Amino acid sequence: MRVKGGSVTRQRRKRWLEKAEGSWGTRNTSYRIARQTVIRAAEYAYRDRRNKKRDFRKLWISRINAAVRELGYTYSQFMNALVKANVVTKDGQGLNRKMLSELAINNPEAFNQLVNKVMK
């Protein structure tokens, strides 16, 4: 006797198609392609949640470097001076790169004072 799956198969397929809503073309109507789309989207999301952390760190370093170079120093010299002055520590205490980047953008005067104080 032939088994068609009935409501179980329909529910499973409906679940995949609902997850593929918002996709373009056949990707949200064809079960097979919709399922591939959802799986690939999940893989990209997983990968990019990790890449996001790298990208933001790169951005913060670039901003700090640009702000410090205006004052005649390099990023590595500045970070070394911060570590020696115990402003930045390895265990996460003190200022981090995100804070320094925000300070450089939103309050350049305070950032310049910090640089001048640390680089003496």
Swiss-Prot record:
GO annotation, biological process: ribosomal large subunit assembly; translation
Keywords assigned by UniProt, alphabetized: Ribonucleoprotein, Ribosomal protein, RNA-binding, rRNA-binding
Nucleotide-binding found in the keyword field: no
InterPro entries: Ribosomal_bL20, RIBOSOMAL_L20_CS, Ribosomal_protein_bL20_C
PROSITE patterns per the UniProt record, alphabetical: RIBOSOMAL_L20 (PS00937)
Family the entry assigns: Belongs to the bacterial ribosomal protein bL20 family.
Protein name: Large ribosomal subunit protein bL20
Species the sequence originates in: Ureaplasma urealyticum serovar 10 (strain ATCC 33699 / Western)
Gene name of the record: rplT
